[in-house]
């Protein structure tokens, strides 16, 4: 298998800032070029107060902080920046409408080839702010036009991210991963919320025609394992196991195609 370029987005479990599983997956796939845009503490949904989105548009990578700028949509924007020729305005077109990031925020760097594989594993942190309690509003947002996606829920944010990436990288194989199970007293990471997030991710993958990796059940990192192997962030043994699992899921899917 020849994967020239691998790109991943996500939270601390994927990010090189913490666990680095995204980069481990890339190495198992023998990717020649890797961009790991994931960040610790990142959420899938933009931060919001009620219906008002309070996430700033930025191309600056946050340093593992629980802040409003640390979200999937800004990771997507950083990927677009890397894909845009150096010095050019960052632009993309969806449904015949052109979007652009103002030059004062940032311009293209041209540091990334078009990815063959895009892997997104994010949702564990959704709900860590009271106003951002995770909910399944897929039915309410799944038919909205791209321009109407507010990114103030997981479904809206994932739909926006996938459709943006499909527009810019139409030939890339995109994989969305469901969250790992955890062992923690934090309510937003309990089993019921994990299952809710899993359902949203599966629905978005089906709607957009991308692939879904069911890490929640398929990785083997269940609640009983998490209890003694890192609770939220897998220990060294389980980082290897999870990276192996994800890489095999990607490989088997690509072989079928």
Q: Model features per residue range: what roles?
A:
Residues 51-52, 179-257:
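Catalytic His-Asp segment of secreted/periplasmic serine-dependent ester chemistry enzymes
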